[in-house]
């Protein structure tokens, strides 16, 4: 009898957990911004932080910087094995970008994850007395980025620019994109839990 009750409790607990995870996953998906019709009026922040990872993030950050060279750009999470000159060489035929590298672009080679990105961005902004930042990253990454950056920054000091990954934004459902979203959700879930318990 006791065994049957325990088994029933186990089934109910498992079922409730599935419901909770499903609801939370749906919430995560709802937090992924569209990359179309974005409001770009906030590009005049004091600084721009590009989180390395998917393609187009760095080029998007540089394009924003070109619109206002009074800003400063941090490329965060650069592989330690990649030299600054190697990155600059990618823009060898772009005179304007080469000039920006000489005056307005910094590299962070310490960060290896999103938490460290947020921490190093905080140190960078503090040292350069930057009050507002535009964070540039892939759209599916933004929900977790908001959580991690909230550890160091006030909400009203941060703005976000989501970079398109899939060809047709959310409507382009590919195996690779589904895999990325699932793995990113697992990280998002872990980060969410870390605000409740120390992990």
Locate predicted features.
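N-terminal Lys/Arg-rich, disordered targeting/topogenic segments
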Residues: 1-7
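A structural signal for short, hydrophobic/glycine-enriched beta-strand patches
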Residues: 30-175
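Aromatic-anchored segments of alpha-helical transmembrane domains
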Residues: 20-24, 165, 185
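Hydrophobic membrane-insertion alpha-helices, especially the h-region
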Residues: 10-27
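Hydrophobic alpha-helical segments, especially transmembrane helices
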Residues: 8-9, 58
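A transmembrane-helix-recognition feature enriched in membrane-embedded lipid enzymes
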Residues: 173-199
């Amino acid at each position: 009898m006791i065994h049957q009750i325990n088994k029933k409790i186990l089934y109910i607990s498992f079922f409730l957990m599935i419901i909770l995870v499903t609801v939370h996953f749906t919430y995560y998906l709802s937090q992924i911004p569209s990359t179309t019709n974005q409001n770009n009026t906030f590009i005049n922040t004091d600084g721009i932080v590009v989180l390395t990872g998917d393609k187009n993030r760095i080029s998007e950050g540089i394009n924003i910087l070109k619109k206002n060279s009074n800003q400063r750009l941090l490329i965060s999470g650069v592989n330690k094995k990649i030299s600054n000159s190697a990155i600059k060489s990618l823009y060898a035929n772009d005179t304007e970008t080469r000039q920006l590298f000489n005056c307005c672009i910094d590299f962070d080679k310490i960060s290896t994850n999103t938490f460290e990105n947020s921490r190093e961005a905080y140190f960078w902004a503090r040292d350069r007395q930057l009050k507002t930042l535009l964070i540039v990253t892939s759209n599916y990454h933004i929900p977790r980025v908001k959580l991690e950056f909230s550890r160091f920054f006030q909400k009203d000091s941060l703005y976000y620019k989501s970079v398109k990954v899939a060809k047709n934004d959310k409507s382009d459902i590919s195996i690779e994109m589904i895999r990325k979203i699932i793995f990113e959700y697992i990280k998002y879930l872990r980060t969410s839990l870390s605000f409740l318990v120390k992990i």
